[in-house]
């Protein structure tokens, strides 16, 4: 079978990126079908309506392109492998990234297996802004061409084997080009806005949503000097570097500079704050990461120079990485970095290549 006669199942989300991905693959001669994944069905309110609208859009695009759309329900897998872990991390006072977990457990595991075993696919494809390159018989994950939209940060857990079975057609394009293709084709998704926030929360208020699953425990807000200046409604609602939603103004003797969360004392349920976004307590010289995933799946030993992102929209930080043991590394930044947050992911790069990453276990504070 020639490469292009191979069967590709495109994860159709009802958005513009997956819509254009399906068309691009058709143009390349692949045998294309779509799959709409339902990953959440805990409530049938607003999210149900959004999912129904997304499915209708995905169906309209598939009809327009003349391809079959399959549907599958991964809600049980999502609950067990993504959502419960998400809640456990929040409960422990950390700030997880469910998109990374969803890609790891659902889109590139459950979907990949379902497409291959049930639908006879040679490849899956998604609308992610990343690229793939095959070097020395191994697939590598590269940043998307559009640096504003690059999503490699969210896909660092993928192995070279998973990448070898995945296609990323829009990774070679910039977002405005993708929208233009969709407009020229008259696709209903052409002007649809990009989804933001956590998929299972949608447009709902985060506090309200989280409060349904985890009991909030109010506690003290204290300054780095130990003064009590307010009450928080629950540590899980706050993340390092946050300034909005603290409900505190300046102190009588202090400046009017805004307050930022600089630490959480989970054991005593205390939120620690300081004034100024570059307060020393907010800065870190490095971090310890665990639960490592290297794209090439080779164990990392010794040290290396590379760059790291400790959150999605961040400029690359030059750093030195040192192996501590099989599943832990120490990362030392060239310059101190603000708001390094336990539970989030540290993702490593060598130029355009995403090497892999891990979960931030602890940050290394500035020496006092």
From Swiss-Prot:
Keywords: ATP-binding, Cytoplasm, Disulfide bond, Nucleotide-binding, RNA-binding, Transferase, tRNA processing, tRNA-binding. Disulfide bonds join 102-199. Residues 97-99 are annotated as: Interaction with target base in tRNA. GO terms for molecular function: ATP binding; tRNA binding; tRNA-uridine 2-sulfurtransferase activity. It is found in: Cytoplasm. Signal peptide: none annotated. The active site is at residues 102, 199. GO terms for biological process: tRNA wobble position uridine thiolation. GO terms for cellular component: cytoplasm. Interacts with TusE. This is tRNA-specific 2-thiouridylase MnmA. The gene is mnmA.
């Amino acid at each position: 079978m020639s490469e292009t006669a191979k069967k590709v199942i495109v994860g159709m989300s009802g958005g513009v990126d997956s819509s254009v991905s399906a068309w691009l693959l058709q143009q390349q001669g692949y045998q294309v079908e779509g799959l709409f994944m339902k990953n959440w069905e805990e409530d049938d309110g607003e999210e149900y309506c959004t999912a129904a609208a997304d499915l209708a859009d995905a169906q309209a695009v598939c009809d327009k392109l003349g391809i079959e759309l399959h549907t599958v329900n991964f809600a049980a897998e999502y609950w067990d492998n993504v959502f419960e872990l998400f809640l456990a991390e929040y409960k422990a006072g950390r700030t997880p990234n469910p998109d990374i977990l969803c890609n790891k457990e659902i889109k590139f595991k459950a979907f990949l297996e379902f497409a291959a075993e049930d639908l006879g696919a040679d490849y899956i494809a998604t609308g992610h802004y990343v690229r793939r390159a095959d070097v020395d018989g191994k697939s590598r994950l590269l940043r998307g061409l559009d640096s504003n939209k690059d999503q490699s940060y969210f896909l660092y857990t993928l192995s070279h084997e998973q990448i070898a079975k995945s296609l990323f057609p829009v990774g070679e394009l910039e977002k405005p080009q993708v929208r233009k293709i969709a407009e020229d084709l008259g696709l209903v998704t052409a002007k649809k806005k990009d989804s933001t926030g956590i998929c299972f929360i949608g447009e709902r208020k985060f506090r309200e949503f989280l409060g349904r699953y985890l009991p909030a425990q109010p506690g003290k807000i204290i300054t780095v000097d130990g003064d009590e200046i307010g009450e928080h409604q629950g540590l899980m609602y706050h993340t390092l570097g946050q300034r909005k939603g603290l409900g505190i103004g300046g102190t009588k003797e202090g400046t009017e500079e805004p307050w930022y969360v600089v630490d959480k004392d989970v054991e005593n349920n205390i939120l620690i704050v300081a004034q100024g976004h570059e307060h020393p307590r907010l800065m870190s010289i490095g971090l310890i990461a665990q639960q490592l995933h290297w794209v090439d799946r080779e164990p990392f030993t010794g040290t290396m120079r590379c760059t790291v992102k400790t959150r999605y929209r961040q400029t690359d930080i030059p750093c030195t990485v040192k192996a501590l043991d099989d599943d832990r590394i120490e990362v030392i930044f060239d310059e101190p970095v603000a708001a390094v947050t336990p539970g989030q992911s540290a993702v490593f790069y060598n130029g355009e290549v995403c090497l892999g990453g891990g979960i931030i276990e602890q940050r290394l504070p500035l020496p006092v």
